[in-house]
Amino acid sequence: MRVLVLGSGAREHALVWKLAASPAVSRVFAGPGNAGTGEAGTNIPEVKPLAFDTIAEGCRAHRIDCVFVGPEAPLAEGVVDFLASLGIPAIGPPRKAAQLESSKTFSKAFLVRNGLPTAAAEEFSEAAPFERWVRAQGGRRLVVKKSGLAAGKGVLESEDPDQLVDFGASILREDRLLVEEYLQGWEVSIFGLSDGRDFTVLPPCTDFKKAHDGDTGPNTGGMGSICPVPWVDDALMGDIRARVVEPVYAALRKEGLCYAGILYFGLMITPGGPKILEFNVRFGDPETQVLLPMLGADLGSLCHAMISRSIARVSAGSGTAGAALGVVVASQGYPDSTEKGTLVTAVPSVREAESVVFHASTTRDAGGGVRTGGGRCFTAVGLGKDLAQAASRAYEAAAGVTFDGAWYRRDIGRKFMT
């Protein structure tokens, strides 16, 4: 099977890296890819994820059997529908189902309509009624969410009415918003793989969304992640499956929204049980970078099962023994601003049994040097017998990634090691 991974981030590098090791995959390509995917597979730089004609040409020229869509934007724009019209199988939802991620108002309505566990919420499209509602809440902590795509940064948690109103007003100039009750508990990421009918579930992950140590600062796309999650035992996974995963897939089938691809369940484990915070309709970043090294099953075979409606005949397994921890190395100014084109002076050589360094949007200049693409530039992943060993190896690798302005959180996973 010849697979094209669409995208250029660290998630896509991890996908190319894992697929390249699959006996079910004869060639793996990345479009446009980055400096890392060009080492693990073959880049097609002419392919642009939002320029569908370039995807079609890349698929034709390289005889692609399956397209694995990495980022959310082309899914929201209907790339899977486009590929289906050409007879090319794809891992990802059609445009209608992609609204589970691209429209928080759509996904909240889906959850409420089907009686699925989620936070109570109100929807607003105008600033004045939103402000009146917020100021009537007596200063309780609330969560304001942009309805549309926001790269993980369209959320504010606060009890300050002025802050909430200002943030909401900035959203309402261009989009709708949801305001939700604030849920307390532990967050966990669950990924389901479906063939459009049946599904299997991967080991749990959790990510670290805040920019700075101690879970402080603004939200980001994610500054690190771990897999598995120490406090998620078999009993809790069984509860999540019974109360969330199975009912969600049943509701998707009932409404004609089930698809061949990935569904991410962003969950809050509250004293009253698991509640759904959000859906993504693709693998997460940085969760993918720790999940795939821990995946005992062959990813190529899982991809074939998803597009051939045979996921019930394969198993994703329970994951390999040990732990993985990922540390995102970001550029100066992230998440508020980004510097691009900085020369990377070192990327460490690592033993894959101990660590892996995934590139994000890096490029090679005319002299062969690696240049940053801004924002989150690398994910350094450590593997070990436990989280502490994985953290030690991840931070050793992260320290070896050097470029002007590079920075990273120093406490990824620490709260789970005490």
Question: What is each model feature region?
Answer:
Residues 1-95:
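ATP-binding N-terminal substructure of ATP-dependent carboxylate-amine bond-forming enzymes
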Residues 38-40, 99-105, 212-214:
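Short, charged, surface-exposed secondary-structure boundary motifs
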Residues 43-51, 122-126, 158:
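Short acidic-hydrophobic, aromatic-tinged amphipathic segments that line or gate anion-handling sites
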Residues 91-154:
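A conserved helix-loop-beta module that forms one wall/lid of the active-site cleft
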Residues 154-288:
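Internal nucleotide-binding/catalytic subdomain
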Residues 241-263, 280-352, 365:
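Active-site "cap" helix and flanking loop/linker of ATP-utilizing ligase/carboxylase catalytic domains
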Residues 362-367, 371-418:
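Generic C-terminus detector
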